[in-house]
Amino acid sequence: MSERIQKLLAAAGAGSRRGIEEWLRDGRLKVNGQLVKLGDRAEPGDRFELDGQVLDTGGPAAGEAPLVTAVLLYHKPTGEVTTRRDPQGRPTVFEFLPPAPSGRWVVVGRLDVNTSGLLVFTNDGGLAHRLMHPSFEVERRYLVRVRGAPGPELAERLRRGIQLEDGPARFDRIEPQGRSEGHSWYQVTLSEGRNREVRRLFEAEGHEVSRLKRLAYGPFELPEGLTPGKSWVVPGLELEKLLAGLKTAPNLR
């Protein structure tokens, strides 16, 4: 299933989405030997070139045996970015990962620099696509802290849905988790991954998010005891069981 080029390459860690959009505007990118422009789409298995140099997007090189799928869970602390390189010199999550058993790690569903919690990595581009594309409706679960003491009507409005600048948005589930020291806590679930969507939903209702932590992504949960900055490779048999529950076909409603 095709995806916008900047989204595919950003997910593979080739650069920031904004930076990749600049490459497209400047005519520096080719896909399968053809020059592409902003707005064009590509498949995860396509060949990408920047200024004539092939970009490594995590798949096997020509002639190599197919990859054995691996998944790594990382507890991202705040302050780290999810690109391979950062022009501002900030630490990137890739600096703290062990080598992939084959191929290289691709991040599934980025987190912004001020968000902590679960990051999923895989060396399988097809699996990454299934986990990220909205048509597969993979749930993401977060713990959110907002300033103040919103009334119960806030949860109801965000469950029904509101209009953001890039279209309607809503939480599939939103559950109050109590209050402490001038803040209110919620656990929220949604099945798409638009840029800063959790923060923007609350901000659209006048409530600033002061802390955001991802707890789960699809079948993967942040392991108990996995401290910030640490990672864990899911064992093969456990991974097989977890992936068995994934949708194998997109919802095309």
Q: Model-predicted segments: where are they?
A:
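Basic, flexible Lys/Arg- and Gly-enriched helix-loop patches that mediate nucleic-acid binding at interfaces
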Residues: 1-253
